[in-house]
């Protein structure tokens, strides 16, 4: 088995060899895992089982907080068709709003758009990803957790200030710099934080773990 830790409440498990590609065996194993978690931790969990990480993730979210959704390869298209575009990992509020402006709300709607239009609207990388994702195509392997990479930018203001617009302008500038680095390195992120030092040298910070990985800052 290959275990990939994603966050404090999310992980992927490749059990292809253990279950010999049999979805009935995979379903039985998933129920065993759910029961074990309930017995030992007194917690419920949602599990999605499918042929790749993308569909497994969507299936896991489908019946939260205590569901088990099995999507075999020949049922992927039928499963995805009525779902809202937002269920695709990486599609955030801004992208969803852009699709609404194009009168596109479901995955079935979005499948009417060709890859060239998506690439023109969202860039080649994102456009191609979305074109494949809505068709259930994903070859991202389950892999052991890699060492976390942190991207950050820091600045010292020319003057102390409580002016919201002034502070926001500087923050947006830092966000753009970090975003440019992320795009240059072809990375995605799932956690984001801000750290600042006040005029009396006290420190404050705030961080958040996102629902899905994204490259949109």
Tell where the protein language model's regions lie, with residue ranges.
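Gly/Gly-Pro- and Ser/Thr-rich, intrinsically disordered tail segments characteristic of DNA damage-repair
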Residues: 1-129, 142
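DNA-contacting surface of Y-family translesion DNA polymerases
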Residues: 100-217
């Amino acid at each position: 088995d290959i275990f990939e830790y994603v966050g404090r409440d999310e992980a992927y498990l490749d059990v292809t060899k253990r279950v010999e590609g049999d979805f009935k065996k995979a379903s039985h194993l998933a129920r065993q895992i759910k029961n074990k978690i309930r017995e030992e931790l007194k917690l419920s969990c949602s599990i999605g089982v499918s042929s790749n990480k993308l569909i497994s993730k969507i299936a896991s979210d489908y019946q939260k907080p205590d569901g088990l959704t099995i999507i075999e390869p020949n049922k992927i298209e039928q499963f995805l068709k009525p779902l809202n575009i937002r269920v695709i990992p990486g599609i955030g509020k801004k992208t969803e709003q852009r699709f609404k402006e194009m009168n596109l709300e479901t995955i079935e709607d979005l499948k009417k758009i060709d890859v060239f239009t998506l690439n023109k609207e969202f860039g080649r990388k994102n456009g191609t990803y979305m074109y494949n994702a809505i068709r259930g195509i994903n070859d991202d392997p389950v892999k052991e957790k890699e060492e976390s990479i942190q991207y950050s930018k820091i600045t010292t203001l020319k003057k102390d200030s409580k002016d919201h617009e002034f502070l926001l302008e500087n923050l947006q500038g830092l966000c753009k710099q970090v975003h440019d680095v992320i795009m240059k390195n072809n990375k995605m992120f799932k956690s984001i934080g801000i750290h600042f030092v006040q005029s009396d040298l006290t420190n404050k910070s705030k961080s958040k773990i996102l629902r899905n990985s994204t490259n949109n800052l």
